[in-house]
UniProtKB/Swiss-Prot annotation:
Pfam families in alphabetical order: DUF493 (PF04359)
NCBIfam families in UniProt: PRK00341.1
Recorded GO CC terms: cytosol
Cleavable signal peptide: none
Family, as annotated: Belongs to the UPF0250 family.
Highest taxon of source: Bacteria
Listed PANTHER family: UPF0250 PROTEIN YBED
HAMAP family referenced in this protein's UniProt entry, alphabetically: UPF0250
Protein name: UPF0250 protein PA3998
Naturally occurring in which organism (per UniProt): Pseudomonas aeruginosa (strain ATCC 15692 / DSM 22644 / CIP 104116 / JCM 14847 / LMG 12228 / 1C / PRS 101 / PAO1)
Cystine crosslinks: none
Length: 93
């Protein structure tokens, strides 16, 4: 048996500028607008110039990536919960 140190997830220091959020969901009209609207509720300083939208290779999915200033864990959890509640989001990274 080998001794391995406890592995802990990296700690984020808040506020964290340029924190990336990537949202993957079904491609469809208004998906990126919906993602931006939800994230702006929790991060009003969202710079839409950082918005990157990509289609999947077969066009079934869309990924939307933005950069925010993350203020705390509660903010990130609220963004995640609201995005998942839409029913259109498959994954939030």
């Amino acid at each position: 048996m080998t001794d391995t140190p406890d592995v802990q997830p990296p700690k984020i220091e808040f506020p964290c500028e340029r924190y990336p959020i990537k949202v993957i969901g079904d491609a469809g009209e208004g998906f990126s607008d919906l993602v931006v609207e939800i994230i702006q509720r929790h991060a009003p300083d969202l710079d839409v110039e950082t918005l990157v939208v990509r289609d999947s290779s077969k066009g079934r999915f869309l990924s939307v990536q933005v950069l925010i200033t993350a203020t705390d864990v509660d903010q990130l959890q609220a963004i995640h919960n609201d995005l998942r509640a839409t029913g259109r989001v498959h994954m939030v990274l």
